[in-house]
């Protein structure tokens, strides 16, 4: 096992430029047909992917905040599902435009001053508020490495970079309970194995009170909204900053959460 993974881990650990902003890492196919398919691509065999999936799943379950392990799990288990999501985007005018233009979300692409100047209640202002209140940054999303198709690599990168948008849309904080609720919504929306795994096994770390609230109120709400809303990857969020968050929720059929979960863990 160690022998099979050693070349991958060596390239993973020694990969230059891992701290570059997301906007500087375009996901575009090589024109010469040789070498990596996109920036940071690490080609792996099916067996190597299986070993990486098993190891990353164990680490992600042990520590849900190991976003690097969650990222590896998503890339090594979601190939078929990513094709379905890609096809959904291709069939939607807004989604097709996203696939064509490949927008990225990072501090180098966001005009934070403009977002701050937007009216209260707008998507852009509320997204910025979410980042500030929860002390998170869009620059923490790892670049895609193990998806052997450059367009599918962009799809999963886009999913990662709009994750905080989903927190904003659903009104969920970044504590454990909030993350699990978002994972249930994402599991229904995307069908990605890592989302399903996180949705089912994430609650293991919850206390009795939070678990009861999750099962009785928050999971049914997240599942219902996930089924009712159109594919959230088809939203060109960067062109909707000025739209009212309330209006966007109404457009998507997303209702208010049944309770405030900021103080729960």
Swiss-Prot record:
State the Gene Ontology BP annotations.
ubiquinone biosynthetic process
Record-annotated membrane-spanning stretches: none
Metabolic or biological pathway: Cofactor biosynthesis; ubiquinone biosynthesis
**Which enzyme type, at the first EC level?**
lyase
Q: What result is annotated for mutating residue 146 to C? A: In COQ10D7 and SPAX10; likely pathogenic
> What is catalyzed by this enzyme?
4-hydroxy-3-methoxy-5-(all-trans-decaprenyl)benzoate + H(+) = 2-methoxy-6-(all-trans-decaprenyl)phenol + CO2
InterPro entries to which the protein is assigned, alphabetical: Coq4 (IPR007715), Coq4_euk (IPR027540)
Instruction: Give, from the UniProt record, the effect of changing residue 124 to V.
Output: In COQ10D7; likely pathogenic
Q: Which disease is it linked to?
A: Coenzyme Q10 deficiency, primary, 7: An autosomal recessive disorder resulting from mitochondrial dysfunction and characterized by decreased levels of coenzyme Q10, and severe cardiac or neurologic symptoms soon after birth, usually resulting in death. Rarely, symptoms may have later onset.
Q: Which family does it belong to?
A: Belongs to the COQ4 family.
Kindly state the subunit structure of this protein.
Answer: Component of a multi-subunit COQ enzyme complex, composed of at least COQ3, COQ4, COQ5, COQ6, COQ7 and COQ9.
Question: What's the protein here called?
Answer: Ubiquinone biosynthesis protein COQ4 homolog, mitochondrial
Species source reads Homo sapiens (Human)
Record gene name: COQ4
């Amino acid at each position: 096992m160690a022998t099979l993974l050693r070349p991958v881990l060596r390239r993973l650990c020694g990969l230059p430029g891992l701290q570059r902003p997301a906007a500087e890492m375009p996901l575009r196919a090589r024109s010469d047909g040789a070498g990596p398919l996109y920036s940071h691509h690490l080609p792996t065999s099916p067996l190597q992917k299986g070993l990486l999936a098993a190891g990353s799943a164990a680490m992600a379950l042990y520590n849900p905040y190991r976003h690097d392990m969650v990222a590896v799990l998503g890339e090594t288990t979601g190939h078929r599902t990513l094709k379905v999501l890609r096809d959904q985007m291709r069939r939607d005018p807004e989604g097709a435009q996203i696939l064509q233009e490949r927008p990225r979300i990072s501090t180098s692409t966001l005009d934070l001053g403009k977002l701050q100047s937007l009216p209260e209640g707008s998507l852009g202002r509320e997204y910025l508020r979410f980042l500030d209140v929860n002390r998170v940054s869009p620059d923490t999303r790892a670049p895609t490495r193990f998806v052997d198709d450059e367009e599918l690599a962009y799809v999963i990168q886009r999913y990662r970079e709009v994750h905080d948008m989903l927190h904003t849309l659903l009104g969920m904080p970044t504590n454990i309970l909030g993350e699990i609720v978002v994972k249930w919504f994402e599991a229904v929306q995307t069908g990605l194995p890592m989302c399903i795994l996180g949705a089912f096994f994430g609650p293991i770390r919850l206390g009795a009170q939070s678990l009861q609230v999750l099962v009785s109120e928050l999971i049914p709400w997240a599942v219902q909204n996930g089924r009712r809303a159109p594919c959230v990857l088809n939203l060109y969020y960067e062109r909707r900053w000025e739209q009212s968050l309330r209006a966007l929720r109404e457009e998507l059929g997303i209702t208010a959460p049944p309770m405030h979960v900021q103080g729960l863990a």
